[in-house]
Amino acid sequence: MRKTTALLAAFAILAGLTACTGTSTLVKDGSIAGCTPTAAPAGAASGSVTATGALRTAPKVSFPTPLHVTKTQTSVLVSGKGRAMTAGDSAFYDLTILNGRTGKVVAQGTYDSIGDGFGTIAKGAAFEAVTKGLECAQGNSRIAIVANSQDGHQNKVYQGIRKTDSLVFVLDVTTTFPAQATGHNRAPQNGLPSVVTTKSGQPGIQIPAGTVPKTFTKQLLKEGTGPKTKKDSFVVAKYTAVGWRDKTVFDSSWTIGEGQAKVIGLGNPGVVAGLRAGLIGQKVGSRLLLVIPPKLAISDGSDQTVTVPTGTPLVYVVDILGIAQ
C-alpha cells in the first residue's frame, strides 16, 4: 500500500459531497463536535480558502494572494462524521499543498486510495502543519490549513518557496483511528511479563525473573470488538518492543509525545515473523502481549528501520487501532 507519492515524500523531508465551498462549519464558539482546536484555531486567512470538487478527488483551491500568517490557522470546509480527533489519534488523508504567496500548487496526492498521507496528533511529529491542523478533524471531512513558514516548511527554501512564505494545505481526512486500544480488559496470565500503561496508553513492560521462554505466547490484555485482521491486512498500531535478556526497549511508537501510530503490512516479509503471526486474526481495539522466541524473532530485514536484537526472545505490546482499507 502506498502511503505517500514521491513528490509528497520529498516535500515531507523538508517539512462524498460535490461543489464544496470554503465556508467554515465551525459553530460560534469555534468547536467541532464538542472539540475546540487550540493549536491552530480558525482565522480570517484559513476562512478565505475555498476548495471545490468532491471529497477524495483533487480539489480546485482558491484564495486571495498573497496569503500570509504568523500563526497557523485551520478552518473546516466540509463537515465530517464521528468523533473529533484529539491528542494521540491518527488519520489517513489526501493532500494538496499550495504556496500562499503565489497560489501555485507545490504538491498534490493521487487521490486514488485510502490516502497518500498518514499522521498522528503528537508533539514533536515531523509534519507540524498537518499535526496541528488535524486537531478536532473528523473522518470524511475537508479542512484548510494556512501554515506559517515554520510549521509549513521549517523556514526552508524549496521548489519556489521562499523562507518566509506561508503554505496552504487542503486535507481530505478519509479515516481516523483512536489513540489507544479501546477493548475490554482481560485478566493477565501468570509467568508472563507484566504491563502497566500511562494515561496516553504508553506501555511499561517488566520482564519476570526465571527461565527464558522458548515458545511463542500471545495474551490479550484488552479484547476489542472490531473486525479481525487477515494475513494481508495493513494494521494501524502502536507498540513497544523489548529484548528479554537485556530488558531494553529497542523499538517503540512512543519516541515522541502521545505516540506515533504506524502501519504494519502483515503480508510484508520485512515484518518480524512472530509479530506478524501474533497479529493475524486479532480484533481491532485489542491490546496484545506477544512473547516471541528467537526462532520467530526474524525477518528478511527489508522493512526494518531499527535493529532487532538477536539470540533473545522479544516482547511486544501492541495496540491494534484499525485496519487500513
What role is predicted for each listed range?
Residues 2-325:
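Cross-family detector of peptidyl-prolyl cis-trans isomerase
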